[in-house]
Amino acid sequence: MTNPDCSLLSMPKTSAPLPLTAETIAIGTELLIGGRSDSNSLFLADELCKLGITVRFKSVVGDERQDIVTALHSAVKRARVIIMTGGLGPTVDDCTREAVAQATGHRLGRRKEALEGMTARLAQWGRRPNTGQLRQALIPSGAVVLKNPVGSAPGFCLRWKKALIISLPGVPREMEEMMCQEVLPLLRAEGLASGGFPREPIVRQVFHTFGLAEADVDAKLQGLIPKGAPVDLGMLASPMGVLVSLTTKGRQSAPDNNRHLLQTLADGVRSRLGDWLFAEGRDTMEEVVGRELTKRGLVLALAESCTGGLIGHRLTQVAGSSAYVDRGAVCYSNRAKTEMLGVPADLIDQYGAVSKEVAAAMACGIRARAKVAVGLSVTGIAGPGGGTDKKPVGLVYIGLDGGTGQPITQEFRFHGDRNVIKQRSSQAALDILRRWLLEKA
């Protein structure tokens, strides 16, 4: 944060803490026409809940100045913290700065600290600012400039009426870094200035499952929450599994008791879900698998067909994965399976490329060629075409060879479009590997 103006944070102190309410405004026409999903608001809601700030409303507007102005006029009537994401780039449709200035009656002006920060960032990339990028240094008068540690577009915050407006870039990585480094300290100060946050911030624990339908997870957790307990149980299904959440309900009168209750309920979730539970918090399946491979000193090789390298991509997104991922082969055609993995052509002719026999041969083949501890394979029909009555779209076989001479294979029947089937196939393959690793403990 650059030279914060303490007047931005000053609010009359009260005898009891007042709950801070928030609204998020996601800006971008692509969010309204199916081009992109709004992941920023989910991240913001999670971070705000940790502070005890309740998100009451969420708006999504296109790249139209007047629409943004209208959204701000609505938000200021019902929220004390307004966080906007998007519209701070260098192109003509990036008009958040102009919209905030128009709505609040502030003038736009080029700020030295914003220009210097942007110029320094571009210089690191071997570039100089063009006319469009110079617009990113325009900041409403009276606003505090928020530094962007990873991108070129600075953010800003300013007081308008009884609300604090915070404007951040829409690029998720930039927004998240700025939220953590610039905005959260600002909001903590905001809470102190108004007499403190509610006594107990909203606490949320998240659990990730795979292999059970949402209805099955619900059945396992029936009766877990005592009647009248100040905790909500939530579930959200996705191609990656079912997410289960425990969330405390707003301001609590006995925080220690509620923390103890939440921990007791969390233990209940773990006990009831057992091995179906693969991670908690922000952990992903690929991170969990990576830790288990590292713990055992094992190295993996992959042979992928219908997933097209997705499993390898996910695993290598984790820093340090070179310690346990040796190689991956995308063997889409029958010829590739034979030439690269040594799968016998007559085996493919007899059982078909999508079969448990070929999945096993693929896993054994990649493991033997890589000379590693584990070979993991996947073959299937992702669709939309290629299915038959006997082998429909969504049929997937996964193979694992751990060097015992008896490879493991498992059949799945997934539903959804091509992308969903690929995602579920990659998750299922990693889950089979996870369970195999746990058995070796």
Spans of features found by a protein language model:
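A short, flexible N-terminal coil/short beta segment enriched in small residues
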Residues: 12-35, 299-303, 307-312, 320
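Glycine-rich phosphate/diphosphate-binding loop of Rossmann-like nucleotide-binding domains
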Residues: 17-59, 258-260
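Glycine-rich beta-strand-to-loop/alpha-helix junction loops that act as flexible
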Residues: 27-29, 84-92, 169-170, 249, ...
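Glycine-rich oxoanion-binding loops at beta->alpha junctions
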Residues: 45, 49-74, 110-151, 336-374
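Proline/glycine-rich low-complexity loops and linkers
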Residues: 67-73, 77, 94-191
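Accessory alpha-helical/coil subdomains and C-terminal extensions
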Residues: 159-240, 245-247, 257-262
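Short alpha-helical segments enriched in small residues
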Residues: 255-441
